[in-house]
Amino acid sequence: ILMGVGEKRRELPSEFRGELLPNIRAAEPFCRGCLVLEGESFENDADLAKKVAADPRFAEWQMIVLHDRIEYARSAEKFLWATWTRFDPARDIFSAETKLERNHISYSGPCVIDARMKPWYPAEVEPHPDTVKLVDRRWQEYFPK
């Protein structure tokens, strides 16, 4: 997804300048060509990713990831974790056009991943602040260089 080979085909956008759809609160690029959208919860708009994929104002973006929080666009660690642990490839990938070519699915951009929390997912587990402080304080003891 983030690799290209061969001759350059297009300029990848680095900024979103359009008007947002209803139920989309924010848009920020994660990297050139990959836009993160903060959208309404899955419970309140289950078809939002499908709407984004079909909307022409997002046509210049090759990859769009729909999240619950825009902050995931601001950190590679958060983006990768929140994206790849919160979508099911069989049900959460949408595109402007989908074709079957030689028994392979072919997506035409934008390709939208719905990485919002779903009602059937377990709740996020957050560490207790005291535990975080203890581990941070003793990290070198646990894992000396």
Residue ranges and their predicted role:
Residues 1-145:
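Charged, compositionally biased interaction regions
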